């Protein structure tokens, strides 16, 4: 009897395809069991007691392995049930897997899988809550408004947690906490929003906010990037900077504190005295401009036989400058008081303004000899040197008498215009009263680089503790160039305003010097290299940087009287300076919210550095006095103390400003007042009637014979009564004591002394 080996389809030609199906299934079960154990450990869930790799269960699964192929198979193989034979049918393997699934407790594993995400959420929630509580106890919760990502990253590296403002990730903040936990991963936005939701009811201990925002969480004294002060000494506005410039003379100290600032006038209000002071300054500047024009030109270029300007114009200008020198040398309050000019002086001033304008703008000629003009030029130089030594800011003036008009509370070059005509200036400020314009002398002789105007952006940090006010200056800065070459013949903003917000709207002029940067910015190293190439004196930059510090210290000191000294308050300022021809800095303005965006490769490098170093000074230094402060340098420090009462609270004096000559509101009459008024009216009526009867009665009815009225008095009384029919008697008759009985006098006294 021959036996036939039946080879299942699919097994021919490849004996090792299913080499050991039992070991294959066992390996799969081991892998699944290991994954289940790992998942249970992560979710803190106990592993099912029945193990899938139990040898006993596996033996029971495969004890009847030979029978899974069917009875016919065993007969065909000669009754052999050996497992060494690898000739199996596909149905036998499928039945084996089904048998294994049916006999093992897989339903327990399936039912426990939905609880794993919930357990993971609980674990993540507990971890986040622990971090939140720890951050609150260590005062490490912060809120940042705006796109100051450098500040966020710097604080997060220090272990701080962010309390998100409502505008940041608004869509994610509208989701539930469970939905956020499903997608939360380390460092992603979902995790940040989950932590912010948990931290929402805790105060923030570091707040970076805008200037106009309300100060929140004041009770915990957070680090806040805002220092509040009154608007009259808020140097981050034009109006406040003017107020500080008026006060800084009381704090001036050579080498420490001093302010270089173009002279200014507030023409935005109805201050007539300041308007008159500006007109006087404008006329004085016109006189100096004319003398500068004469000094800068040769005498032969200024004269002509057909000239229309006489020497009296030069005499008037010299007289003006002489008067200025006398006032500067012997300055007193009487000299400072502006007196209204006489009619003759008004005519003389107007004549001078017309003729000097013809010379400066139309190149009109003088009708004098060359020798006389040379003498005028010598005197002009003499008096100009005297006044410039007394007033260094006059060295910045030229011969154009230009003034720059700035809105009092605007920034980024908005609303700024340049004018030279007095009428145009006064008309512009009158038409824009709501903008509170500041009129400032334009710097006509600045330091130029390759015939182009520039300014310097310097950073200052102001910090306040419970006992000190610290002024920090940054040792790095950058230059901003105009896109056009400098000229006084064209007054467009693209030439004279170097703000990046203004210059980015214009293209660079094609014939501009090729050595200037295309992005209109230089780093400090590039500027130092330029100074070395141009042969500037040694120490020029040190002189400039020390001037920066002196200006900023003077501004802060002048504003301290109106500054709220709150512990942990700080503020970062962007300060704009120009340089004169001798590398002396001139303060232009101070911005409380400087632009820190990476607009160019220069700002992309320096702005993040400034923010990182700011966090070092504000956050790290109070905890560690030896902590690094980056490039911030302590320029000045002021110690202060607040007088406190017995209860430990600062002493305060609260009051209300008294207003004189104000019509007080009429009070509502009480019942008692109305009753008194009614009684007084009745008394007044009865008294008037009695007086009229006494006046009209003949003298014989009066008991006292000495009280007879003379004929002359009778005539005057009758005349008075006839002209004022049924009116009150004349004052003469009323004041005659003899005709008033005691009852009448009592009634009159009651009438004029009772409360109204």
Swiss-Prot record:
GO MF terms, alphabetically ordered: ATP binding; protein-glycine ligase activity; protein-glycine ligase activity, elongating; protein-glycine ligase activity, initiating
Function of the protein: Essential glycylase which modifies both tubulin and non-tubulin proteins, generating side chains of glycine on the gamma-carboxyl groups of specific glutamate residues of target proteins. Monoglycylates alpha-tubulin by adding a single glycine chain to generate monoglycine side chains, but is not involved in elongation step to generate polyglycine side chains on alpha-tubulin. Has the ability to both mono- and polyglycylate non-tubulin proteins such as up (Troponin T). Required for early steps of spermatogenesis.
List of residues binding ATP: 440-443, 453, 455
Record's protein name: Tubulin glycylase 3B
Keyword Glycosyltransferase: no
E.C. designation(s): 6.3.2.-
Gene Ontology CC annotations of this record: axoneme; microtubule; microtubule cytoskeleton; nucleus; sperm flagellum
Species lineage: Eukaryota, Metazoa, Ecdysozoa, Arthropoda, Hexapoda
Organism: Drosophila melanogaster (Fruit fly)
Gene field: TTLL3B
């Amino acid at each position: 009897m021959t036996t036939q080996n039946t080879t299942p389809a699919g097994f021919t030609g490849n004996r090792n395809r299913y080499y050991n199906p039992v070991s294959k299934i066992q390996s799969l079960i081991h892998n699944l069991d290991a994954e289940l154990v790992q998942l249970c450990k992560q979710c803190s869930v106990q592993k099912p007691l029945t193990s899938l790799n139990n040898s006993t269960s596996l033996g029971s699964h495969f004890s009847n392995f030979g029978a899974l192929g069917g009875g016919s198979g065993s007969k065909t193989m000669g009754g052999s049930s050996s497992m060494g034979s690898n000739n199996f049918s596909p149905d036998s393997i499928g039945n084996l897997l089904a048998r294994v699934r049916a006999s093992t407790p897989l339903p327990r594993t399936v039912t426990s899988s939905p609880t794993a995400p919930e357990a993971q959420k609980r674990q993540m929630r507990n971890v986040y809550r622990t971090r939140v509580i720890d951050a609150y106890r260590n005062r490490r919760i912060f809120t940042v408004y705006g796109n100051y990502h450098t500040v966020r990253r710097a604080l997060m590296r220090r272990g701080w947690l962010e309390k998100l403002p409502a505008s940041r990730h608004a869509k994610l903040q509208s989701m539930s906490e469970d939905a956020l936990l499903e997608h939360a991963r380390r460092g992603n936005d979902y995790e940040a929003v989950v932590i912010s939701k948990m931290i929402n009811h805790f105060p923030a201990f570091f707040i970076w906010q805008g200037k106009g925002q309300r100060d929140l969480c004041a009770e915990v004294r957070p680090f806040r990037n805002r220092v509040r002060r009154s608007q009259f000494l808020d140097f981050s506005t034009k109006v406040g900077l003017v107020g500080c410039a008026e006060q800084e003379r009381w704090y001036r100290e050579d080498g420490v504190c001093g302010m270089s600032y173009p002279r200014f006038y507030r023409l935005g209000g109805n201050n007539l005295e300041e308007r008159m002071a500006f007109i006087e300054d404008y006329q004085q500047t016109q006189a100096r401009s004319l003398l500068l024009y004469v000094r800068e030109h040769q005498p032969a270029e200024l004269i002509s036989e057909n000239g229309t300007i006489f020497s009296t114009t030069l005499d008037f200008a010299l007289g003006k400058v002489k008067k200025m020198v006398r006032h500067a040398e012997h300055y007193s309050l009487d000299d400072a008081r502006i007196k209204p000019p006489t009619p003759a002086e008004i005519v003389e001033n107007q004549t001078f303004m017309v003729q000097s304008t013809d010379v400066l703008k139309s190149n009109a000629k003088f009708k004098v000899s060359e020798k006389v003009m040379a003498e005028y030029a010598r005197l002009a130089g003499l008096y100009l040197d005297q006044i410039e030594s007394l007033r260094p800011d006059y060295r910045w003036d030229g011969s154009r008498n230009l003034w720059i008009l700035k809105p009092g509370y605007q920034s980024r070059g908005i609303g700024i215009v340049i004018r030279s005509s007095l009428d145009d200036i006064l008309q512009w400020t009158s038409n824009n009263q709501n903008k509170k314009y500041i009129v400032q002398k334009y710097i006509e002789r600045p330091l130029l680089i390759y015939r182009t105007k520039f300014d310097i952006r310097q950073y200052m940090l102001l910090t306040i503790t419970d006992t000190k006010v610290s002024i920090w200056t940054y040792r790095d800065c950058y230059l901003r160039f105009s896109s056009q070459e400098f000229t006084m013949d064209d007054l467009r903003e693209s030439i004279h305003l170097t703000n990046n917000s203004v210059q980015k709207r214009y293209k660079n002029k094609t014939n501009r010097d090729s050595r200037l940067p295309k992005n209109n910015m230089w780093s400090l190293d590039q500027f130092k290299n330029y100074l070395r190439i141009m042969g500037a004196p040694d120490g020029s930059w040190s002189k400039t940087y020390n001037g920066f510090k002196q200006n900023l210290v003077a501004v802060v000191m002048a504003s301290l009287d109106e500054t709220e000294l709150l512990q942990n308050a700080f503020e970062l300022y962007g300060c704009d300076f120009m340089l004169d021809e001798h590398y002396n800095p001139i303060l232009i303005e101070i911005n409380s919210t400087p632009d820190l965006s990476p607009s160019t490769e220069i700002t992309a490098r320096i702005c993040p550095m400034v923010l990182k170093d700011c966090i070092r000074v504000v956050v790290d230094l109070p905890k560690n006095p030896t902590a690094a402060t980056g490039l911030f340098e302590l320029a000045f420090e002021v110690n202060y103390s607040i007088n406190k009462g017995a209860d430990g609270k600062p002493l305060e004096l609260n009051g209300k400003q008294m207003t004189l000559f104000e019509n007080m509101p009429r009070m509502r009459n009480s019942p008692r007042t109305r009753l008194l008024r009614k009684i007084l009216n009745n008394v007044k009526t009865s008294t008037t009637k009695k007086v009229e009867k006494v006046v009209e009665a003949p003298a014989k009815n009066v008991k006292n014979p000495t009280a007879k009225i003379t004929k002359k008095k009778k005539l005057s009384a009758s005349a008075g009564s006839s002209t004022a029919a049924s009116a009150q008697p004349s004052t003469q008759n009323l004041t005659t004591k003899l005709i008033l009985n005691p009852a009448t006098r009592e009634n009159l006294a009651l009438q004029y002394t009772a409360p109204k």
